[in-house]
Amino acid sequence: MFAEIITIGDELLIGQVTDTNSTWMGRELNKVGIEVIRVVSVRDRADEIIEAVDASMKRADIVLVTGGLGPTKDDITKQTLCKYFGTRLIFSEAVFENVKRVLAGKIPMNALNKSQAMVPEDCIVINNRVGSASVSWFEKDGKVLVSMPGVPQEMTTVMSEEVIPRLCAKFRTDAIVHRTFTVQNYPESVLAEKLESWEMALPACLKLAYLPKPGLIRLRLTGRGQNRSEVEACVNTESAKLEAILGEDILDEEDTPIEILIGELLKKKNLTLSTAESCTGGSIAARITSVAGSSEYFKGSIVAYANEVKTELLGVSMETLEKRGAVSEETVIEMVKGAMKALKTDCAVATSGIAGPSGGTEEKPVGTVWIAAAYKSEICTMKQETNRGREMNVERASNNALLLLRKLVK
């Protein structure tokens, strides 16, 4: 069963608003066996909306439209869909009651808000309990188009409570089963080469996808078929083969973020952690503290961007900085020791590098980052030398620091 998503709004195309709706819909539809094959964004222009709708209705079984249902003049989705389906707008007392309920005590009722009760005559109107814009369900030639509000909270509510259950009742869908493995220590091309024979022999019902992240690769194995038990058995069989090939290079089998894995490991071993960060600017600490309950094992961070902070708060010697430089193995070793001492922790990570876009030299180009991880008296280091732009360099360094710590503590 195939679906297409059409998001409507000039704000999406000029980058003023990020389309999170499509990501959420794709994930939730996939859970019930509906595969999204295309996502299209169009402006608030009637001819462009009609063109997109017509193309999607020809290709897909289900078309999901979001946006353009507000009360202002630039919200033209309802009128445009009426034109496409050859119907007209009529006033709905039931929808008007819902509009009054939603707006009560918040916004005065005026003609624009009352216009929210105008709905297409030839459609199933679905109530929106958290907003004033109703949902329109159209059927044509065995296919379904659903028009929903673009406000994420409203869309997710009506999709979860109304649209997805109705789609499941109307259409027979395949079972889709995913297993995602997070793999470390491999460039994508090297990993693909290692898995080539296994991948070539996969059954037709299975598909493998490579999803690179800075310092990591996620392998998503997807099985699809009418019998869920058979699909799950097939996925499990091939997953076992993959595990035998990659062994300890598999970091996780549930696509769990590394910061959560680190937290679980530290809690299990009753250890405490601190960070000393230069080029990563506190991003490692931010990731660690994004996990609920991290106060059980994380004590704090020293963001030592300037050399004087490295010396005064972390105890890095001026001699090391002058002879080896801030971006050096010796410096991060002293930083990680200083963090453990200052914050009295069992383990720590430290980073110092050149994130870019400027500041590099021939000896130490942009993207050079030294990373250290310490666990009690043990210290290990690594040098990162890949330049993928400032943001990516920082993210990669953060990942590598946490991976290095996990390897040391595990």
Swiss-Prot record:
Pfam families: CinA, CinA_KH, MoCF_biosynth
InterPro entries in the record: CinA, CinA-like_C, CinA_C, CinA_KH, Competence-induced_CinA, MoaB/Mog-like_dom_sf, MoaB/Mog_dom
Top-rank taxon: Bacteria
Family: Belongs to the CinA family.
PANTHER family: NICOTINAMIDE-NUCLEOTIDE AMIDOHYDROLASE PNCC (PTHR13939), NMN AMIDOHYDROLASE-LIKE PROTEIN YFAY (PTHR13939:SF0)
Name assigned to this protein: CinA-like protein
Organism, scientific name: Bacteroides fragilis (strain ATCC 25285 / DSM 2151 / CCUG 4856 / JCM 11019 / LMG 10263 / NCTC 9343 / Onslow / VPI 2553 / EN-2)
